[in-house]
Structures are given as structure tokens and as C-alpha cells.
Amino acid sequence: MASFRLLLLCLAGLVFVSEASPAGAGESKCPLMVKVLDAVRGSPAANVGVKVFKKAADETWEPFASGKTSDSGELHGLTTEDKFVEGLYKVELDTKSYWKSLGISPFHEYAEVVFTANDSGLRHYTIAALLSPYSYSTTALVSSPKE
């Protein structure tokens, strides 16, 4: 239990530090950002495949956006404020491919976060994930858009 609390504390610190540093002009307009950390190596998780889906009226998940995390473990520019409308979204991280590329056999095929966005007006979302081969933890930072 103490290890789990420590992981959550580290993840919360990651989000706090990343949000405390000034964002570039392009980042301030990014309504959905993903940040991934490798808990084993204590570093950003680069080249993690990310898929975003939006729940359609017929209850199916439609592809919405995709990309890979940068060397800093971040993925910006997934969508625009105009396209990121109110709805139910799913962010899927390809954790299996990430760990396999490091020569590690993981337990999970992927990690996913399902959330409702913009139900109280336009917001910006940072989805942060802390990965290990046999577990993952996620948190989110939801903020008002910066002018």
C-alpha cells in the first residue's frame, strides 16, 4: 500500500511540475494532452502509441485522434478546441508495444482512460499515466482554457 501511495504522489508531482512550467504558445490552445512516465526507469515514456476514441450516438467508439508520445513522454496537438466537443472519450495507451520494445513482457495489453469532456463548458485536459509492466496509474488535470 505504501508503494501505491508513493506512485500516486510521484504522478501528482509530475502533473504539478508540468503545469507549473510555462507552456508554449501552441500548448496553451491544446485542449487534450497526454503525458506518460515509465515508473521502472524513472523517465518519460517515449514513443507510446496513443489512440483517442469518441462515443457515438449508436454507442460505438469512433476513432477521434492518434499519435505517439515524444521524447518528453508528452503528446500535444491531438485535437482543436473546435473539434473537442462535449462527449464521452476514451484514451488508449499501447503499453504492450512500449514494454516489448524494451525487452519486457507486460501484463496489460493497453491502459485506457474513459472520461466525459466539456460537460460544464470548454475545458483543457491533461491525462497523465504512470506505467510499469504489471500496473498503471492515471490522473487528470482539468483546467479552464488560457487566453
Curated annotation (Swiss-Prot):
Subcellular location: Secreted
Modifications made to the protein after synthesis: Sulfonation of the reactive cysteine Cys-30 enhances the stability of the native conformation of TTR, avoiding misassembly of the protein leading to amyloid formation.
Phosphoserine: modified positions: 72
Single annotated GO MF: identical protein binding
CC per GO annotation: extracellular space
Range of residues in the leader sequence: 1-20
Positions glycosylated per UniProt: 118
Functional summary from the UniProt entry: Thyroid hormone-binding protein. Probably transports thyroxine from the bloodstream to the brain.
Name of the protein described by the UniProt record: Transthyretin
Gene it is expressed from: TTR
